[in-house]
Amino acid sequence: MAHIALVAILALLTICIAIRAQDTVNATTLTGKYMCGYQGWFECPGDGSGGGWFHWFNSQNPVHSSLNVDLFPDFAEYAANELFATNMHYSDGSVVKVNSSYPLTTEMRHFKWMKDYNIDGVWVQRFGPKHVGWNDFTNKVLLNCKTAAETYGRVFVVMYDVSGANNSTLFNDMTSDWMYLVDTFKVTSSPRYLKHKGKPLVSVWGFGFPDRSITTDVAQQIINWFKTGAPAKYQATIMGGVNDDWRTIGPPWDSVCRSVDIISPWFVGRFGDIAGADSWKTNNLIPDVAECKSLGKEYLPVIWPGFS
């Protein structure tokens, strides 16, 4: 069935390589997991969030010329009250409706699909503020994922994306947010929050990218805090989402990228055909794995469902 592939579009999933899931996923290790990135950033007027259109369209006019996704999902399995009308129409004249990430029913449906089709869990992504009300929205999505993971025996992990972040406040913003999630939302107390190497797992995505504002000193400060600098209940095993040239980037990013516990290079869009994939395997994947082995680091490759 195509719908799990379509979850990739509903949440812009990037699927991390691993193996078959079980009815209740082992939440003590990342090893052997088939995990997806869950961005949860689709908003619709009337979804309960109090916001307008976000990410489905690049304006508040929900027409095809403003559509902001590459592939359009099949919503056949959604209930009528989960969908929100646009100003677009299908060829038969019926109104095109889309889903929001805000209602709990959305995450419950996605996590049920993940259980049905043997996906172990998700990286629930957290971005800096996108608009007024964004923090409340993204908190609701995270709590929805927590509830859905607990219901369907999946796992979830917080993934911070530094895209667009303010470098001067990023360390305080991220560490304060993590402490809030641990203390107020009790995310790491959930039996479905994924642990690895005896600690909760956290990912920070965006190290070593030339178009991200984060500097090496702030990146290293964040890594050190999660690994050993924070009070014990906030410490975590940290996975770094790094640029594809992490191994050859040179100083000062080379030492930063090598200081995380798990290295996960960004593959998305790096090749577009079989020949390109073969070249990537030879020139990146194999030497990346060898480098990680020599460093005593773990390695998590990424695949994606296919879009421009």
Where is each model-derived feature located?
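Glycan-processing catalytic domains of CAZymes
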Residues: A21-S308
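Cleavable N-terminal signal peptides of Sec/SRP-targeted secreted and luminal proteins
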Residues: H3-I19
